[in-house]
Amino acid sequence: MAKKSMIVRNARQPKYAVRHHNRCKLCGRPHAYIRKFGICRICFRELAYKGELPGVKKASW
């Protein structure tokens, strides 16, 4: 889990745009961030399996 202080700090708008860090909106994870959805890969996987992400379906070939 992300540190509570980092989640709160990231929620505020930074003074300079370069200081912005991509963090998951649900859990605050800084790595494996998917820009299109604004969440990390773990949260993405959970939501996709539940069917809560529109337009996402499991691949099969």
UniProtKB/Swiss-Prot annotation:
The record's GO molecular-function terms, alphabetically, read: rRNA binding; structural constituent of ribosome; zinc ion binding
From the UniProt record, give one GO term of the biological process aspect: translation
**Any one cellular-component term (Gene Ontology):** small ribosomal subunit
Among PROSITE patterns, the record links this protein to: RIBOSOMAL_S14
Sorted UniProt keywords: Metal-binding, Ribonucleoprotein, Ribosomal protein, RNA-binding, rRNA-binding, Zinc
Locate the residues binding Zn(2+): 24, 27, 40, 43
Has keyword Ribosomal protein?
yes
**For this protein, what does the record note about how its cofactor is bound?**
Binds 1 zinc ion per subunit.
Q: Which family does it belong to?
A: Belongs to the universal ribosomal protein uS14 family. Zinc-binding uS14 subfamily.
Q: What does this protein do?
A: Binds 16S rRNA, required for the assembly of 30S particles and may also be responsible for determining the conformation of the 16S rRNA at the A site.
Q: How does it assemble?
A: Part of the 30S ribosomal subunit. Contacts proteins S3 and S10.
Protein name from the UniProt record: Small ribosomal subunit protein uS14
Say which species the protein is native to. Desulfitobacterium hafniense (strain Y51)
